[in-house]
Amino acid sequence: MSSESPQDQPQKEQISNNVGVTTNSTSNEETSRSQDDNVKEVNGNDDTKEEEQEEDAELDDLFGDDNDDDDDDDVKKSETEKSDSDSDEDDEGENINHRSRHRESLGLDDDEAEEQAMYTRKFYGEDANNFSDQDETTHTFKEENVELVRHIIPSKANVNETASHNEIFYARIPNFLTIDPIPFDPPSFEAKVNERASNSASREDQLDDRLIDENTVRWRYSRDKDQHVFKESNTQIVQWSDGTYSLKVGEECTDILVNDTSNTFLTVSHDQQELIQCYEGGEIKKTLMFIPTSTNSKIHQKLSKAVIRRNQRQSKGPGTYIVSMDPEVEKKELERKQSQILRDRRRRQLKEKEKQESPDAAFETGFRKQNSPTTYGASRRNEYEEDDFLVDDDEEEEAAFDDEEDDNEEEEEEEDADEENASRLRNLKREGAAMYREEEEEEKDRSETKRRRVAVIEDDEDED
């Protein structure tokens, strides 16, 4: 039991309340302190993060960042694409303006401008339309020192230049004439001749090579008295007083026949541009033909001998055989010919036997009939022995049997014909022998009468 008064109780409650307030205030202060600590910790973490980001930024400034590089590349690509598209549009516009200015300067309409563009593509390629004046600055040029051989203009004779001397002639080179387009060089020519002489074993080949060398048109560079260089040739074309021409190669002359021609032009072909360009007018109105002066000339005799040697060599060479028949058909034909040869041989043997036999016909026929089956059987056995193949099919066997029967009939007919011929021959022999005996007897009688007359004449002379 407590001895406290009611006045003391409210004081206690007030104290307790104050104590509670103080406790609450102290707890609030503690929470606020904890929150302040947390805020300080968060602020501290933020400060560390900011410091780390600043350090990373400094490193990125030194070494660069991958993400920044990718971003920069994307930005650059977009900028270049925009610039390329803008430049293409500008180039197209400039090309159109350039073509329009070019068309206006030439005074061409649309059709003529298209035709002109086609020709420019033919000459300069497919990229000629994209060419402009500003493109010249973008091209790169390279320089190089090149030595070009400058050929001398061919010399002309000092004649009056008329229309006849300025014409172009077309000449077909004959077989006995050769043209060497390379300038003549004595050392190289001697080396070539020695090489051919060492390689060619036969004298005929050497003669042919010499004939070619003697009838070759050559030229070389030479100098005159004033040391002026000019072209010199071993060939000349001579015009005689009657208007005819001759070709002089070395010491040999060849006649030239001049004929008229038409629809012939001398041109140079440009394959890439698909064009043909004429040379100095290009029209050819005359043709030349080279023929030997006579059959007694040296060149004609040498050519004829060379042709004869070539024909002889060709005739001595191996011949060619062209197969124009089926091998199976050819084989059957050869077999048939072989069987015919055997039959002819048997016939000759029979005739020889008949000649050797006696004139008695009965005896000969009987002897022949006795011997004929054996010879016939032997021949048939030989035919079977000479057969090189076997027949398995029944139809082929029947066909072969029919062929054998036909052969037998033919052989029998041939034998009968041979017998008839033999009998005729014997009769002719008998008749000839009888006639020969009669002639001998008549000659004997004549000789006896002559002898008698001679003897009688001699006796008369003795008596006188």
Curated annotation (Swiss-Prot):
Biased composition (Basic and acidic residues): 30-40, 74-85
This protein's record includes keyword RNA-binding: no
GO cellular component: Cdc73/Paf1 complex; nucleus
Residue ranges with Low complexity bias: 16-29
Modified residues (Phosphoserine): 105, 132, 188, 358, 372
Compartment(s) of residence: Nucleus, Nucleoplasm
Residue ranges with Acidic residues bias: 48-73, 384-420
GO molecular function: RNA binding; RNA polymerase II C-terminal domain phosphoserine binding; RNA polymerase II-specific DNA-binding transcription factor binding; transcription coregulator activity
Keyword Transcription regulation: yes
Pfam families to which the protein is assigned, alphabetical: Leo1
Annotated stretches, region: Disordered: 1-111, 344-464
GO biological process, one term: chromatin organization
Major subcellular site: nucleus
Keyword set, alphabetical order: Activator, Nucleus, Phosphoprotein, Transcription, Transcription regulation
Protein family membership: Belongs to the LEO1 family.
Other remarks in the entry: Present with 1110 molecules/cell in log phase SD medium.
Role: The PAF1 complex is a multifunctional complex. Involved in transcription initiation via genetic interactions with TATA-binding proteins. Involved in elongation. It regulates 3'-end formation of snR47 by modulating the recruitment or stable association of NRD1 and NAB3 with RNA polymerase II. Also has a role in transcription-coupled histone modification. Required for activation of RAD6 ubiquitin conjugate and the BRE1 ubiquitin ligase which ubiquitinate 'Lys-126' histone H2B.
Self-association and partners: Component of the PAF1 complex which consists of at least CDC73, CTR9, LEO1, PAF1 and RTF1.
Protein name: RNA polymerase-associated protein LEO1
Native source organism of the sequence: Saccharomyces cerevisiae (strain ATCC 204508 / S288c)
Gene: LEO1
